[in-house]
């Protein structure tokens, strides 16, 4: 039974479909690291991970220690890589929970090594290489090769993998992504010349998987990191238009009408006088607000779906509630409202909401609050 009159509905069959879309795009002998950071982009990390592991995911990828620990409590043996930076103070937690850390410095490798030796355990690490995003990672040069040799020589560490991240693979012109892969491949070849090999080599995110798997750029890769595509969205609108792969909608934001009232002409609805009743108006209140992830500025800007009818969202969205105009709409208290979801319901999807807000669907769905229950269908 729902504890609130608002929730996120998650289509698990679509999660499975999208996972296999990723699986079918990569080489048959390669593995998938399902990226489930940010609560699986708002879908719910535990359930999404369960689905992906059932369908054959080999690894899980997160951004933070807390995300990794949440998963470890339910999946005691699954490999979990923390893709983001792990402070030195997290070393013992990483070791005790058999997590895999990303590193890019000899200094941190030394700290992790000492902690592992003290615990009489070992810590798996993946080396991050910066091939052109200029965010985190070692530069792909001779100095880094010498550093990698020193890191590999440290006791207590298992240098399991090496990876980079593509910054612009969702563009129509793939020059930058291909240059990044050219740099990464050249660096891997230099390492091979020094007899330095890694169990896992990865670079492709959703954009790389959807657009760069038919070339030679991925010849060294054996692990792939789908993220946004697992949740039903293409990395860009340009890719949506050109991509042959079909992705299915996963996420719907829903709420129930908790009260309907008739407001007389000449009144303001909600905070700040942002909706004025030019005539007697039927108003429905929903128990859903910006603290749940429904952006405040969507008031007076979108229509929502109620019983296969479209009704305007009016006024400014409040922290915990919002309003719909119900004149001419067949609706009653307790009826379900779709704020965004599958296009077949007549509602906007999260990508359309993102475009309206000049952002991306990653943000629209990953900011859905944990105080919203996830309902899996």
UniProtKB/Swiss-Prot annotation:
| E.C. code | 5.1.1.1
Q: Where is the active site?
A: 37 (proton acceptor), 271 (proton acceptor)
User: At what positions is N6-(pyridoxal phosphate)lysine found?
Assistant: 37
Q: Which co-factors does it depend on?
A: pyridoxal 5'-phosphate
**Residue positions binding substrate:** 135, 319
Record-linked InterPro entries: Ala_racemase, Ala_racemase/Decarboxylase_C, Ala_racemase_C, Ala_racemase_N, PLP-binding_barrel
Q: Please verify whether the record's keywords include Isomerase.
A: yes
| Annotated coiled-coil segments of the chain | none
Going by the UniProt record, its keywords in alphabetical order are: Isomerase, Pyridoxal phosphate
Keyword Isomerase attributed: yes
Taxonomically, the superkingdom here is Bacteria
Q: Which family does it belong to?
A: Belongs to the alanine racemase family.
Q: What does this protein do?
A: Catalyzes the interconversion of L-alanine and D-alanine. May also act on other amino acids.
Under what name is this protein listed?
Answer: Alanine racemase
Source gene? alr
